[in-house]
């Protein structure tokens, strides 16, 4: 039997790494002016109350309001498991204007994701998706571009090694869990996705 000392956590984690948010974790405000606030949303916290997320103890919108002392409104959403920049508006009119820009695809969204396997260097998933409680699937499109690949010489299941790729993901629509579901559809599951992976 081999015993190991507990691993020390690096004081400088990798860029984009977010440990689970707790009630005392400060929010990182990336930008703020009289009309907008941009928050670095960590993975693991729901943006707002909804029937899809159940009854969490806290929500990012409440934390942002408490941290800034301002009434703020969501301009868009990010899934609980997703980290990234979240835009908040200082009033309802600004939130509506930003929401329109997202709906009209005037805002370009880019994500990074590590997937299992090596997909083609670039591609497009054009596959309709439905949402819980909504009638029928709606059009959904996601473009991807492969940035890097790696192979790990550790057997898993029937495979003698594991292959992974880093992708740039650009959703052209904004459907429920679109990126995770589209990656599942092309059999290159997002690493860490416990629902579709």
Where do the model's predicted regions map?
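Short beta-strand segments enriched for Tyr within beta-sheet-rich domains
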Residues: 175-183
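Phosphate/ribose-recognition catalytic cores of enzymes acting on nucleotide-derived substrates
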Residues: 183-197
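A short local structural element in Rossmann-fold oxidoreductases
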Residues: 99, 180, 191
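RNA pseudouridine synthases
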Residues: 3-4, 11-166, 170, 183-186
